[in-house]
Amino acid sequence: RINLQSRFQWPSFDAYQTYAASFDTYFRSAKSGLGLFVLSDIQGEGFISTSEIKGLYSYQLNMRNDWTVRFGTELGFGQKFYDWDKYVFLDQIDPITGDVSDQSFSEEARPESLQANYFDISSGILFASKSVYAGLSLRHMNRGNDGIILLNENRLSNGVPLMVSMQFGTQIDLNRGNKRNSTAFISPNVLIVKQGDFGQVNAGAYISSSFVFGGAWYRYSWTNADAAVLMVGVQSGIFKLGYSYDFTVSALQAYSSGGAHEIAVSFRFDQSDYFKSRAKKYNSIDCLQLFR
């Protein structure tokens, strides 16, 4: 499977532009999966640019009553660049007019290096049956240091905060009377994320038929409502295309942020007639339909 994604958050502010690509495959005989993930993220018209590349490995342990446990680990390398010349400091602002001159000069000390390189380690576990799943993941376990400000040759940053996420949900078959061609289902699900002092909850449902799919979620942070998310897409054979939009419902909506647009394209080779006819022989992806 190959996935391509792009996300534009708060486009009215030129805030975040994110591009990602990934590949994963499953080796049935080894009960294992391998994957590769690359990401490029641009914040504030290039004030901060982040690039990452990560390798993934997972292992499936079969249990009783059709339950499985999947263990996964992710090892990666990241690079963060700070465009110092785009920053505006207090001593560059005219105290009377508030203007910033192109020729203004700041006495802020320019860091010796504007680039930070770091390693990243993550892991997770997923319990799943044919209709229910629950998972826990830990990201940035080693807290790689992505800061550039030095104090006595040590970076002031304490590293990337540990991210803990929990997810659980169910998959309900909507074609129980026609199990041979059962493709339609609905999946209510919840995602809880905690990183540093920040936390949020996503709750909603994903629905899919043989050709179209969609979903709706509500995202709430620890202190306020954040966004309502709607998604719609089409799928046929190996091809899957989805679009989602985040409707801002926080106080930020007063500033016409533009919400967030996300487009995702997947090429699911395990859904081709060739691989379906040889599912036991070749490397078909073995998971709930929700994750395909």
Task: Identify the function of each model-found stretch.
Residues 1-292:
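Subset of outer-membrane beta-barrel
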